[in-house]
Amino acid sequence: MKIVYVGDNRNRGNFGCRATSTALSQIISKDNEIVGRIYGKYTNVDTGELFFYQHFPAWIYKTVSKFKYWKYLKKGLYLFNRMLKKGHYYFSNFDFIDYDFDKSINNLIKCLPANPELKEFDLRQYDFDALVVNGEGSFIFATPPWRECLVEAMLMYWAEKLGKKVYYLNGMLSDDPYSKHNEKTIRLINPIFSKAEVISVREEYSYKYAKENFSNIKLKHYPDALFSWYDYINDDFKVNNAKYIMGMSGATDNSFYDFDFSKPYICISGSSSVGVVANSKEEIVNVYTELVQDVQSAFADYNVFLVDVCEGDNFLNDVAKITNTPIISIDTPILSAAKILANARVYISGRYHPSILASLGGTPCVFMSSNSHKTRSVQELLEYEEIKEFNVLPDKDEREKIIELAKYKINEGKNLRNKIQLRCLELSKETLKQQDLFKE
């Protein structure tokens, strides 16, 4: 089967986007050919480059595209338009995506000459049998809607209109805990989902959500594609220090000396909801500075490393400077980063996929909350004895409880690590069964 793969997010820094996009690509390409890839840069919230105005005729886009310095001028126009709209840029006259998907497709086709980077969206160019969407966390039904959700839904609608098969895999379906349930978006997407070959979600919460909110869909449940990396994480390759593996932004002089992974260590990251909950970056930095200092004090015999797993965790670079804590950079090669997490004694985080990477090596996690049910659902998936989430901005009392739980999990030692690792092996076998979906 010839496949167009939507949501290949390896172009992002985010550990989870890079890892699970690759894992799902490996699963679907085992017996199929991927003939087109639509990357996350242009389905996501902001391209920084889009030139579109609802009332421009097609000839305008063709004309400006011939201008020698168009790509530079376009960025300036984009910023000017954003300033004019002042927070109301998306789903406005300056965005091709709309709740009417036929209109969105026509808008896209019309503006392509002036936006050549969007060419990958044009499904007319591919000789393909099926469109596969890497659902990940794109379909959170927030108010206002996530742009990524509508763009990917538009592509599903278009593929179905062309008579192609559509597979929605590796998905999470959820409300946004920080905004209203978006019934309008659900009603729009339901007929698209109902025509798909399969709607496959990665955990029980999403399965229940789909049952409650979508009708007449072919619903299946497989663990996240990232669990298929069990063998990679548990092979013979060891990461003992950072000097051979650090990415460009982390390749400082100190990276040759400050990272010793041969001694017991603890890793700390942020949460996907920290930017929503906090009033300012300063507040985030202050809270995480206190958390890191408390962990360093409580675990004096352990190395402590910060892990910048996502663009939203960039504040950890400030925390690293204040607390003099080494930080593993966001552009660290993904398998090396995974090995580091997988061999920590404990991982404190509100991140979904990085927690899976850690768990594949048996590392127990202490979870903070996230932008959905995902940090709760992954604990259930891993069969944790107690499902526990801490506040994304933990106060002194919660920091003490985080440390207490971290100590307990470390003291459980090999027994707990082996239990987590064995569960991940089971989930690895389960997620690989997605290869059979294309044979049905």
Region locations from a protein language model:
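Active-site anion-handling motifs in enzyme catalytic cores
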Residues: 1-440
